[in-house]
Amino acid sequence: MKKLLFIPFLFVCLAAFAQDITNTPFGKGIINLKSKDNSWTTKVAFRFQTRYDGEFDFSDSSFSDRAYVRRARIKGHGYAFSPKVQYKFEYDVHNGQVLDAVIKWNFAGNWNLWFGQTKMPGNIERVFSSQKLQLVDRSLLNKYFTLDRDAGVQLRHKLNLGETFLVRSKLAISQGEGLNRKAWSSGNSYTGRIELLPFGNFTKKGDYFASDLKREETPKLMLSVTYDYNDNATRQGGQMGNDIAGSTRDLQSWQADAHFKYRGLSFFGEYANRVT
């Protein structure tokens, strides 16, 4: 008996392309695209920060150290349909969690409405991006008193008084439980912040990065106050901290900060108070 054996072959044609040359310079994102009709843009970037700690104990002359990845982030932003509808996202590669996922709508003049998860309008140091810090990390005040990130809605407005004086106001209603919390909440967090800039805007949004990299030619100052009321908070610090076992509590937080820059000199200071 004769048997016929069929052996199928799959032929795949692969095309080789030369390496593309991009016009995007270093520091302007891995992906930086814009549609021909200007209906959308997107910019995606990646960054990481490593850290080394060394500790010497004089009591027993012992030394210990460690090296690790402090942060690794993928972040992007752009607009869709119109420059008045912007979006921002940020993903923490190191810890595997979404940090920011927010839509920003400029619905009228100097009015903006934000919806999603992002940083709360709290102390200035927390709103500094980690890539724009002057020191290796944020302060202990920020660790224990920050409002951090939360999911909700924010209303923002800016008002010019005279030629230079600028007033920015920010209101937020959020779930009050912090980053990536999906549990049902019995209360919300209500936040208000006002920022006074008597000498006008900082160069290139310099009020929200630490050192005076742009070397302000004229003095620039921002004075700010924040109030937050967290109703029926389930965590010790509101948006941060350990869960409160079997109970909730109301938290009131006051924060004040000042930021000054002039010709390479920079200063910022913060005050925070929290009561139950």
Language model: regions and residue ranges:
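Detector for outer-membrane/organellar transmembrane beta-barrel domains
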Residues: 185, 195-198, 203-276
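Short, charged, low-hydrophobicity "junction" segments
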Residues: 18-23, 165-170, 242-243
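Outer membrane beta-barrel
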Residues: 29-179, 183-200, 219-222
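Outer-membrane beta-barrel biogenesis signature
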Residues: 17-44, 201-220, 233
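Short, surface-exposed charged micro-motifs
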Residues: 23, 102, 257
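Bacterial Sec-dependent N-terminal signal peptides
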Residues: 1-21
